[in-house]
């Protein structure tokens, strides 16, 4: 960990996502095939299983540079890694907190991965009191429960996830 103007920064491996976004308190699984992403997973597994996931600006970019990535992403905990045929890996992660990358550090050698110095961001709601926010969450849960009664193919896991919001 380093400090920049009083802000605590963590240095984490970066895994750029294409066509997918991870959020805090969300469990996501995805397949990884690019070497830079595999190296980021390996680096994270050696250092607390924590990784910074951020989206690429362009899906077609195969080897993203720091300028190809969004600065806001999610710090995630790696829960499971499965090796698949064809040198692909399926990863299960849990989003922990939103984060801002102050500095991306490109891989220096082919066997390295990209890193980022990230600052954890606080959860906040613009102009809404805590009481109002709780009321909005309750209303959303009630509406979702009503929807779930009519949805024929809704997984029980979705209802369990809703209950924990």
Language-model regions, residue ranges each:
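N-terminal low-complexity, acidic/polar interaction/targeting segments
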Residues: 1-162
């Amino acid at each position: 960990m380093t400090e920049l103007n009083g802000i605590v920064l963590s240095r984490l491996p970066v895994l750029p996502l294409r066509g997918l976004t991870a959020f805090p308190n969300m469990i996501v699984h995805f397949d990884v095939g690019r070497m830079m992403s595999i190296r980021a997973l390996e680096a994270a597994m050696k250092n607390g299983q924590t990784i910074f996931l951020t989206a690429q600006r362009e899906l077609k970019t195969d080897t993203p540079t720091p300028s190809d990535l969004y600065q806001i992403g999610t710090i995630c905990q790696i829960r499971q890694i499965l090796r698949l045929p064809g040198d692909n890996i399926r990863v299960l992660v849990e989003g922990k907190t939103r984060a801002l990358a102050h500095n991306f550090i490109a891989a220096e050698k082919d066997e390295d991965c990209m890193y980022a110095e990230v600052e954890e961001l606080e959860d906040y709601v613009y102009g809404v009191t805590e009481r109002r926010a709780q009321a909005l969450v309750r209303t959303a849960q009630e509406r979702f429960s009503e929807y779930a009664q009519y949805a024929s193919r809704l997984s029980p896991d979705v209802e369990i996830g809703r209950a924990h919001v």
